[in-house]
Amino acid sequence: MRYILLLLIISFGCSPVFAENRAMKDMCNRLFPEHSGNFTFELAPDSLENDFFTIESINDKIKISGNNNNSLATGLNHYLKYYCHTHVSWYATDKIEMPRQLPVLLDKITIFAKCKTRFFLNYCTFGYSMPYWKWKDWERLIDWMALNGVNTPLAITGQEAIWYDVWKEMGLKDQEIRSYFTGPAHLPWHRMSNVDYWQSPLPLSWLKNQRKLQKQIVDRERLLGMTPVLPAFSGHVPAELKRLYPDAAITQMSQWGGYDEKYRS
């Protein structure tokens, strides 16, 4: 009997429902800790085709139900926007203004998502301010994405750390690889095969930091019900590979954006 009871306790403690609710409570603590205790979150059976959330007032608390964490976060934002008249921006430094007393819902509401896949970001957005973001900046953007129903975010941070390992394993030297990459602000265009070598070499410390940051990013996105869209191999390789593989059919890219001849592979 004791053995069965122990198994039940362990099973409950490790259940997805508990983990999902913890994720939403943590989000509330990040955004408005003074009101975190006024919200409860419940995972509903995921038996319907589209994502959905339900909001209702129960015993002086705002109860939000949904079929996954992404739906719960979207429901939370619906309440913040249309009942509290509160705006949550994606900038970590922007203050979130909350009412002293949370508005009560007279009736329960249920809202369904209009589409299954909700994509966000593109390659160029990773070249504006993102190259210099810390985890706190990404943490806020990921919260914002979840609040706004994004469930398939582009996640390409830190991919150069992987390519560095690949090119090194194939025989290229450290300086050759890091010089092939552009500086941080131009990496999106390097990733799209537009330009190489510009403002290089890329520091090894930056590569290591971005690798660590990407792991944090995708872990949090998955926790909040998202499926990160990761990069694959586009066929773009360093020109220096020709030295190691002289018989390989490597085609030089055309010039782009007025950059000099030397900034292309």
Q: How should these model regions be labeled?
A:
Residues 1-21:
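Bacterial Sec-dependent N-terminal signal peptides
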Residues 20-23, 137:
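Short amphipathic alpha-helical segments
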Residues 24-36:
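Mature N-terminal segment immediately following signal peptide/propeptide cleavage
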Residues 35, 42-49, 54-65, 69-70, ...:
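Aromatic-lined carbohydrate-binding surfaces of glycoside hydrolases
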Residues 86-90:
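Conserved short beta-strand edge segments in small beta-sheet-based binding/regulatory domains
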Residues 97-101:
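Compact, glycine/acidic-enriched structural inserts
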